[in-house]
């Protein structure tokens, strides 16, 4: 029997995208009415309660830039408290560390090389089966707030309902980082509105109203709260929070280049200020969930789409795309119903962006549709093992904008090692336990040759499983018919306002 065939997710031209098969608890002849009633009773007894999901997605928040992760500067008391109640993946990575590719992979459970979503400002094909559509088919109410960055029709343009990939309640915008006057669209109203305060607090305030309404309803819900901080511009953080961080007093990591030290201190003041303000806003969201009694049956996730280099390893502030940990490693806390003894446990095995959707489906007892490429890690989440290990595949298919001078790469991250290869050969080999700031590249050292070969073989295996031929940037641009703009090596977008989006001019970056 086809999975939810009668549900139409989009317009008829792209309807019935789900083709995976889901077993029905019991099928019985409708002529046997008494038996039918009996089966209903069994279904009601055996059907597990569907958990709600609140997914908190931030932007450019480095995995190490939290109090619970050991950052000596930043103040994040509410997320520190959540970490004590959740499973903490210490080596969560972004499959392609930049906004649009991560978000597309998160919603589809697929790799950027498969969907073609490996650049910013691309159009996620409507035919792709996405997170909200799957949960909606299971009877979920779906809601989305904040930054979207998947429609590919100008960053300030209205996103019509058929382009929201299954999200019904909608207060979002394609892309803006004007935090003190952030525009958004209210559901099906095509007239732009503006959040009335610093956007993390405004978005959470509206989300809390939604949660209050949902708490009175038995319908399970999927709520994605997409907060665009602490992505630059950092100077726009509220002064109250900037006053908490004197640039001169900040402790810099030892891998920050001297030439970027002054700039990094200046930017970190605003970066940490955004982080602390966002932590406070998230605290209000978590407090509301507790007050409404939603904690007992809600999966809560806190994560980010990518990190940011902030002067580390000779890469200027604002830059990502590269394979160093400051760029690829992101926070990932997950709290789920019945967590009990697993509270505060850490998992050192990596979780990758495509793994998130199938893992949420696994935790929700929902059949994983065919075509999803990520791995269901729900058993590891429910039975966390700090000693477990696996390889996460990270890729930059076509470096663009500020990263344009770099070569494309493929890399694997394990709980201990990072190994990367560009189109010209091996480029990175770090022992992240012995060398947490990745300052000692082990490539070519005789004593590590065997290990390097093993990691190279594992990378080749991951590429083969995915069918990734690992070709040049131009090959993939031509394959997907992508054309960079004349003035910037990136997908053109319009109505670029000061303080919105990515850096405006490419600056050479060494990898």
From Swiss-Prot:
Its EC number is 3.1.6.-. Induction: By ulvan. Binds 1 Ca(2+) ion per subunit. A lipid is attached at residue 35 (S-diacylglycerol cysteine). The active site is at residues 99, 149. Ca(2+) binds at residues 59, 99, 305. It holds the Pfam family Sulfatase. Keywords: Calcium, Cell membrane, Hydrolase, Lipoprotein, Membrane, Metal-binding, Palmitate, Signal. This is Ulvan-active sulfatase. It comes from Formosa agariphila (strain DSM 15362 / KCTC 12365 / LMG 23005 / KMM 3901 / M-2Alg 35-1). The lineage of its organism: Bacteria, Pseudomonadati, Bacteroidota, Flavobacteriia, Flavobacteriales.
């Amino acid at each position: 029997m086809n999975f939810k065939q009668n549900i139409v997710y989009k317009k008829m031209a792209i309807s019935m995208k789900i083709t995976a098969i889901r077993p029905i608890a019991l099928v019985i002849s409708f002529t046997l009415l008494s038996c039918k009633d009996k089966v209903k009773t069994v279904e009601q007894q055996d059907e597990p309660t569907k958990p709600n999901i609140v997914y908190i997605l931030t932007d450019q928040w480095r995995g190490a830039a939290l109090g619970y992760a050991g950052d000596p500067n930043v103040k994040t008391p509410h997320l520190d408290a959540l970490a004590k109640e959740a499973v903490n993946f210490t080596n969560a990575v972004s499959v392609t560390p930049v906004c649009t590719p991560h978000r597309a992979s998160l919603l589809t459970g697929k790799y950027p090389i498969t969907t073609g979503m490996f650049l910013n400002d691309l159009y996620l094909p409507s035919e792709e089966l996405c997170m909200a559509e799957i949960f909606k088919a299971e009877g979920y109410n779906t809601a989305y707030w904040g930054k979207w960055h998947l429609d590919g029709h100008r960053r300030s343009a209205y996103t019509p309902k058929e382009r929201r990939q299954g999200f019904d309640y909608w207060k979002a915008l394609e892309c803006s980082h004007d935090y003190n006057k952030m525009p958004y669209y209210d559901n099906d109203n095509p007239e732009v509105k503006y959040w009335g305060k610093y956007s993390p607090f405004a978005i959470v305030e509206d989300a809390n109203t939604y949660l209050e309404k949902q708490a009175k309803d038995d319908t399970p819900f999927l709520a994605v709260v997409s907060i665009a901080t602490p992505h630059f511009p950092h100077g726009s953080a509220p002064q109250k929070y900037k006053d908490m961080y004197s640039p001169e007093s900040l402790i810099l990591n030892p891998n920050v280049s001297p030439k970027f030290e002054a700039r990094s201190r200046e930017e970190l003041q605003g970066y940490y200020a955004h982080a602390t303000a966002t932590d406070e806003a998230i605290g209000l969201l978590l407090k509301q969930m507790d007050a409404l009694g939603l904690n007992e049956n809600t999966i809560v996730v806190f994560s980010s789409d990518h990190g940011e280099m902030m002067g580390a390893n000779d890469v200027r502030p604002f830059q990502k795309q590269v394979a160093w940990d400051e760029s690829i490693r992101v926070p990932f806390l997950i709290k789920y119903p019945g967590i009990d003894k697993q509270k505060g446990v850490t998992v050192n095995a990596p979780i990758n962006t495509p793994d998130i959707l199938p893992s949420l489906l696994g935790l929700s007892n929902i059949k994983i549709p065919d075509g999803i490429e990520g791995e269901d890690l729900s058993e590891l989440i429910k039975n966390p093992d700090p000693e477990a290990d696996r390889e996460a595949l990270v890729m930059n298919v076509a470096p663009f904008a500020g990263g344009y001078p770099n070569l494309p790469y493929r890399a694997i991250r394990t709980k201990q090692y990072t190994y990367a290869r560009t189109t010209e050969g091996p480029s990175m080999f770090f022992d992240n336990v012995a060398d947490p700031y990745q300052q000692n590249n082990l490539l070519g050292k005789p004593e590590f040759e065997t290990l390097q070969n093993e990691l190279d073989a594992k990378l080749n295996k991951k590429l083969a499983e995915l069918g990734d031929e690992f070709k040049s940037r131009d090959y993939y641009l031509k394959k997907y018919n992508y054309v960079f703009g004349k003035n910037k090596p990136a997908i053109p977008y319009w109505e670029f306002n000061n303080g919105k989006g990515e850096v405006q001019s490419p600056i050479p970056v060494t990898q």
